[in-house]
Amino acid sequence: MSHVAVENVLNLDQQFAGLDLNSADAESGVAGTKGRYIPPHLRNKEASRNDSNWDSGRGGNGYINGMQDDRDGRMNGYDRGGYGSRGTGRSDRGFYDRENSGWNSGRDKDAYSSFGSRGDRGKGSLFNERGSGSRRTDDRRQDGFDGMGNRSDKSGFGRFDRGNSRWSDDRNDEDDWSKPLAPNDRVEQELFSGSNTGINFEKYDDIPVEATGSNCPPHIESFHDVTMGEIIMGNIQLTRYTRPTPVQKHAIPIIIEKRDLMACAQTGSGKTAAFLLPILSQIYADGPGDAMKHLQENGRYGRRKQFPLSLVLAPTRELAVQIYEEARKFAYRSRVRPCVVYGGADIGQQIRDLERGCHLLVATPGRLVDMMERGKIGLDFCKYLVLDEADRMLDMGFEPQIRRIVEQDTMPPKGVRQTMMFSATFPKEIQILARDFLDEYIFLAVGRVGSTSENITQKVVWVEEMDKRSFLLDLLNATGKDSLTLVFVETKKGADALEDFLYHEGYACTSIHGDRSQRDREEALHQFRSGKSPILVATAVAARGLDISNVKHVINFDLPSDIEEYVHRIGRTGRVGNLGLATSFFNEKNINITKDLLDLLVEAKQEVPSWLENMAYEQHHKSSSRGRSKSRFSGGFGAKDYRQSSGAGSSFGSSRGGRSSGHGGSRGFGGGYGGFYNSDGYGGNYGGSSQVDWWGN
């Protein structure tokens, strides 16, 4: 019995010896080093594995480190889904093959070897995402290849970023952010398929531009007049921007020269690209700087704080997402990764997105403060600060949060960082804020400050409250079926009620206001933009910054209580050189804005109804005894750089003799709806005999 056992042991020893399991030299080449078990199906491949680069890009020590052993009960590299999510079963959707420079949908190709694993931490794997099989709620058109970070890249400055969605083929150029990465037809189609140009640029260029400040850089006439690098110029071409708008002609060289800027331009004038283009071009030229070194030394996955190089603050989530989408376009084929955070969305998902890396952050003030207090965002290395729609942020009560972000945290002080403020209006309060935030800034006024575009024909109609719905139906019936109409109301309840009324009247419509979920708001905007619901009922939440092209008609069903809100509402039409119409329902509830509305109509060379002139005259006499301040639109404080006194330096970027007259700027309009503008108030007859219709045709 024992003899048989001993014999069996000897036979086993002989069998193990035959398998050469204990030969350290055979495997490691180092005497005295204990060998490791090699599965039978891999023994013949071991010698040639390094020559074939099977584990290229995985940064591991061979098969065991490059790919997780199934014995630990976790998914291995082949089980991970094509979007980096574990076990999602999407691995056959296609991967980018670095060696073949194309999309590779084969399961047995080396594209899998670029997926990192537990053994890759700190070894520079190129593509990996932890637990993100679901798409982010705010990346509506984003796919899994569009810029995900990786676990091993603690800094977030990896070679694969959301804004560019590209592999970096040349590792020697890894630190050169100015060189574009490889193109990708699919992402290119996704980002640049829409139209971005207006139809009336010849007249649009006639708008005068005034730049005030010391040593103001000369303006440009073409994007080629200033050096912005290969990446930016390529993306400008893809975006089909043929030439800069007036605000871009002046703002881009000012920002390139690293000057602070306070710019006032009409809505829809290209303000977003005016600051994104020069900021991104400087980031590409300078690289990440100290931010990457700091993150590499101190970052830990899941707990690290992100340090964006640029911060853009916006008042609403819609505007923040819109700026973010533009940033994605201009960050295409670069190493810069844009991110966006805003209230009303899952903060956990936004934190996970930030942890994958963030170089340019677009945020609403409230959510950014939340992220900073959670230790997820640090502004220590922020070189560029942008306040977009600054007056609107103050109107919404964000000044404490803005001052907390800019003055009471770790953001570099003015003079060290570069700060830009953009808005359609700049009343005195905003200019005082600019004095605190900006350093030796240049004041840029495109057109008249606080004015409206002459591409917009403005009509003010006296309509009693009980007649508003009937009058609205008449306007909608006179509008072409393919025309987009934006109807503004004052309250959320009013928006829902009006949408319900129009729906039961047979009109395809949708609505958007603050009580709607983010998903509902995005869906409503999509339905409106696509023309499926050509009527959008909205509160002021949609009035600022939304770039909805081809809006033919804006209707103020309820006029706002202040004239600046009126400017922003009607600015939704006539954008970037297009022509539009704005109709406002006026009655005794709106007397408080009579004088300002009259001044605005006169300034924009619009026809003024006689009843409005009479009301403004009466209102002026009533308020004179109370010492009423000068009108917002009568050339007062907000209409120029308040630093100007006698002899202040200024330069005029355009010597043309004034703005274009736009669409029907001074023509009569008593037309298809009869005489609305007689002194008796609402003029009744919808079937006027004039040959000029409501649209000025």
Swiss-Prot record:
Keywords per UniProt: ATP-binding, Cell membrane, Cell projection, Cytoplasm, Helicase, Hydrolase, Inflammasome, Membrane, Nucleotide-binding, Nucleus, RNA-binding
Binding site for ATP: 241-248, 265-272
Listed Basic and acidic residues bias regions: 89-111, 135-144, 151-170
Catalytic activity: ATP + H2O = ADP + phosphate + H(+)
Stretches assigned to the Helicase ATP-binding domain: 252-444
InterPro entries: DEAD/DEAH_box_helicase_dom, Helicase_ATP-bd, Helicase_C-like, P-loop_NTPase, RNA-helicase_DEAD-box_CS, RNA_helicase_DEAD_Q_motif
DEAD box, short sequence motif: residues: 388-391
Residue spans of biased composition, Basic residues class: 622-631
All residue ranges annotated as the Helicase C-terminal domain in the record: 455-616
Record field: compositional bias (Gly residues): 655-666
GO cellular component: canonical inflammasome complex; cell leading edge; cytoplasm; cytoplasmic stress granule; lamellipodium; nucleus; P granule; plasma membrane
UniProt-listed GO biological process terms: cell differentiation; gamete generation; negative regulation of extrinsic apoptotic signaling pathway via death domain receptors; negative regulation of gene expression
Disruption phenotype: Morpholino knockdown of the protein causes anteriorization of embryos, that exhibit enlarged heads and eyes, shortened tails and defective melanocyte and eye pigmentation.
Location in or out of the cell: Cell membrane; Nucleus; Cytoplasm; Cytoplasm, Stress granule
Region (Disordered): 27-189, 619-666
Position of sequence motif Q motif: 221-249
Similarity remark: Belongs to the DEAD box helicase family. DDX3/DED1 subfamily.
Function: Multifunctional ATP-dependent RNA helicase. The ATPase activity can be stimulated by various ribo-and deoxynucleic acids indicative for a relaxed substrate specificity. In vitro can unwind partially double-stranded DNA with a preference for 5'-single-stranded DNA overhangs. Involved in many cellular processes, which do not necessarily require its ATPase/helicase catalytic activities. Involved in the regulation of transcription and translation initiation. Involved in innate immunity. Involved in both stress and inflammatory responses.
PANTHER family found in the cross-reference section: ATP-DEPENDENT RNA HELICASE DBP3
Protein's name in the database: Putative ATP-dependent RNA helicase an3
Annotated organism of origin: Xenopus laevis
Encoding gene (name): an3
